[in-house]
Amino acid sequence: MIHTVLAALRCPVCREALHQSDGSLRCPRGHSFDRARQGYVHLGTGRKLPEGDTTDMVAARSAFLQAGHYQGVRTTVAGFVPPSAALIADIGAGTGYYLAGALDAAPEAAGIALDVAKPALRRAARAHPRAEAVLADVWAGLPLADGCLDVLLNVFAPRNGAEFRRVLRPDGRLVVVTPLPRHLAELRERYGLLDVDPDKAERLAATLREFDLVGAEELEFPLRLTPDEVRALVGMGPNAFHSAAPDADAVTTVTAAVRVAAYAPADRQLAGR
């Protein structure tokens, strides 16, 4: 395991540091966590995990992202990453697509992809040579040391503001990607996809009340998609559970509209005194 990543990981049971031992990670109190043969480490607490993405959903997302449709989003996310960053984590990383872009922008950094979905972590473990993949639940407490991260990514994923602040350095950066109201509007109308919450901005601000907004970009661009790509787009997220299956003459032009925002800890000035 990459040394920088191992030094940042903590036992999810007792919060002690971890060390490698015969293919597993162990803490001084004897808690042991296996590394799956697919490359990720399971740092769950034994509690029932939230329902993660299915194998089909992950395959759809991987195909869609690798086709380059969200390359502009990935580039914008990477643009908020300081080149000097040493450790980057993506919470709700999925396949590791955005983490890989961030690591390319910070040539000396190591990365941690955290997710609850094993099918996603199998891909995230191979997303970048400088990345490790960890199964962990953001709501159970991240298995990371206090103030260990230079950058934390959160792309279309659940947010735990208090935990984000705990694991981020005082001078660190949080980069959050959220959909705007027009995101995938054509598909929402035609296939009954879930609407973007009109109060999303207010809820986001409340969740991240320990952070100050330091930069943001709104992106809106057309996606010209084949019928198979429309099916992949519908099937790669939570809409897969709620929407009708796209038909053979699926819409070929869809609007993507997202906001990429960067935040800094609100108490960073006090920490620097």
Q: Can you describe what each PLM-predicted range is?
A:
Residues 84-94, 173-203:
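Conserved class I S-adenosyl-L-methionine
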Residues 50-76:
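Class I SAM-dependent methyltransferase Rossmann-like catalytic core
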Residues 6, 217-273:
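Conserved Class I S-adenosyl-L-methionine
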Residues 161-173:
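A short glycine-rich, Lys/Arg-flanked "PGG" loop and its adjoining helix->strand segment in the class I
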Residues 115-119:
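Conserved SAM/SAH-binding beta-strand->alpha-helix loop
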Residues 1-51:
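N-terminal auxiliary segments of SAM/dcSAM-dependent transferases
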Residues 95-107:
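Conserved SAM-binding loop of SAM-dependent methyltransferases across substrates and taxa
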